[in-house]
Amino acid sequence: MAEQDVENDLLDYDEEEEPQAPQESTPAPPKKDIKGSYVSIHSSGFRDFLLKPELLRAIVDCGFEHPSEVQHECIPQAILGMDVLCQAKSGMGKTAVFVLATLQQIEPVNGQVTVLVMCHTRELAFQISKEYERFSKYMPSVKVSVFFGGLSIKKDEEVLKKNCPHVVVGTPGRILALVRNRSFSLKNVKHFVLDECDKMLEQLDMRRDVQEIFRLTPHEKQCMMFSATLSKDIRPVCRKFMQDPMEVFVDDETKLTLHGLQQYYVKLKDSEKNRKLFDLLDVLEFNQVIIFVKSVQRCMALAQLLVEQNFPAIAIHRGMAQEERLSRYQQFKDFQRRILVATNLFGRGMDIERVNIVFNYDMPEDSDTYLHRVARAGRFGTKGLAITFVSDENDAKILNDVQDRFEVNVAELPEEIDISTYIEQSR
């Protein structure tokens, strides 16, 4: 595993297996072929925010027409430099809020990093950096870099020295390593962003790193934090980083269900899961599918089995070298493979626009993880299907917790499902 060769100071935190809560959705805006597919309740357009013309051009290229509710609530204040604490359900465009707000305010100065965005997994950091590249398409003077463990720190040092970015996205372990070896100066940071902030601040080792990095940035700066799940306990921790923040809780925590997502369970023995999965993959219509399992071993074995059964599957898990993970993520995102088998590593924040079915082959360990996993389907308010295998009493208990917490009824999978309920007919 590539991470293990790397010095201690390149700590990453995405290596827990079961306990990794899936990450909400950091949405990549829809591509042109699914134009305007955000659920939007506002008829105002992005022009009303008085954004730079370069940003508006990029927004049009991405196929956005109207801001989502969270964008409508946050962007006008965020572009004025106000601190923001935001919770909104998966797939509602939170990433675009901080990407647009920081690019609107940025005044690039050679050799100075002014925007720092941190998240808890490498894949999510990679994805956010791609969003910055997408939205800064017509801002050629703005340079964006992404830094995370598992790849050579020497390359990162070289980038900072010879082609210093204005926007840095990364994981706290690698960022702190670069700061400690004096490759990376935080003294010009004007915008400090945490995506999936609950995940970062709940883990004490990661929270310590975030706090150390935060203390090394200037006192006067904008601080923004976002997540799909923000418990009452973690909110005060977030507020300690902020000065009089605007707080936007678009959804009451109990109503974090996803519009357009059909959710079902199947009761079966562990030994019956493979046969049932193959049967369902045969009869269901899908664009792309993600199958979540609880361990690296199961991930590898199931992916192999699917390939042997002529299902074009690819696996992503924490045991892979970083380059391999990113390469596979890109293959799946580019639609080269239609079935992905993954551990929780992939659950939170990853955004693949064509996924319309998620299987919980193994039950997630809690209701947060359930939300973040199933949020991979039905992105941007499109239709989707989530099917959860329940094989013992503990599984049943977690499913009951999900139904109680999110006030949703997860029914037993019927013999037949109307295809129009889980797939966009126009696609």
Swiss-Prot record:
Covalent link location (Glycyl lysine isopeptide (Lys-Gly) (interchain with G-Cter in SUMO2)): 31, 35, 154, 162, 240, 255
Chain span(s) of sequence motif Q motif: 44-72
Superkingdom to which the source organism belongs: Eukaryota
Modification type Phosphoserine: residues: 37, 426
Residues carrying N6-acetyllysine: 35
Domain Helicase C-terminal: 260-421
Cell compartment(s), UniProt: Nucleus; Cytoplasm
Modified residues (Phosphothreonine): 171
Entry keyword rRNA-binding: no
A matching Pfam family: DEAD
Gene3D superfamilies: P-loop containing nucleotide triphosphate hydrolases
Induction record: Up-regulated in proliferating cells. Present at low levels in quiescent cells.
Bias type Acidic residues, positions: 1-19
Motif (DECD box): 195-198
This protein's GO CC annotations: cytoplasm; membrane; nuclear speck; nucleoplasm; nucleus
Domain Helicase ATP-binding: 75-248
Modified residues (N-acetylalanine): 2
Entry comment on modification after translation: SUMOylated by RANBP2; SUMOylation modification affects its ability to bind RNA.
Family matches, as PROSITE patterns: HELICASE_ATP_BIND_1 (PS51192), HELICASE_CTER (PS51194), Q_MOTIF (PS51195)
Region (Disordered): 1-34
Catalytic activity: ATP + H2O = ADP + phosphate + H(+)
Listed GO biological process terms: mRNA export from nucleus; mRNA splicing, via spliceosome; negative regulation of innate immune response; negative regulation of RNA export from nucleus; RNA export from nucleus
Similarity remark: Belongs to the DEAD box helicase family. DECD subfamily.
Role: Helicase that plays an essential role in mRNA export and is involved in multiple steps in RNA metabolism including alternative splicing. Regulates nuclear mRNA export to the cytoplasm through association with ECD. Also involved in spliceosomal uridine-rich small nuclear RNA (U snRNA) export by stimulating the RNA binding of adapter PHAX. Plays a role in the negative regulation of type I IFN production by increasing the nuclear retention of antiviral transcripts and thus reducing their protein expression.
Assembly description: Binds ALYREF/THOC4 and DDX39B/BAT1. Interacts with the apo-AREX complex component SARNP. Interacts with MX1. Interacts with MCM3AP isoform GANP. Interacts with ECD. Interacts with PHAX; this interaction stimulates PHAX RNA binding activity. (Microbial infection) Interacts with human cytomegalovirus/HHV-5 protein UL69.
Name of this protein: ATP-dependent RNA helicase DDX39A
Species annotation: Homo sapiens (Human)
